[in-house]
């Protein structure tokens, strides 16, 4: 789960969509 968070940050947190 922690590794997934790092991947999202590298792509620019597209899942969040917020940023």
Curated annotation (Swiss-Prot):
One term under GO cellular component: ribosome
Keywords, in A-Z order: Ribonucleoprotein, Ribosomal protein
Signal peptide residue numbers: none
Domain of life: Bacteria
Keyword Ion transport attributed: no
Subunit record text: Part of the 50S ribosomal subunit.
Family the entry assigns: Belongs to the universal ribosomal protein uL30 family.
Protein name per the record: Large ribosomal subunit protein uL30
Annotated source species: Brevundimonas vesicularis
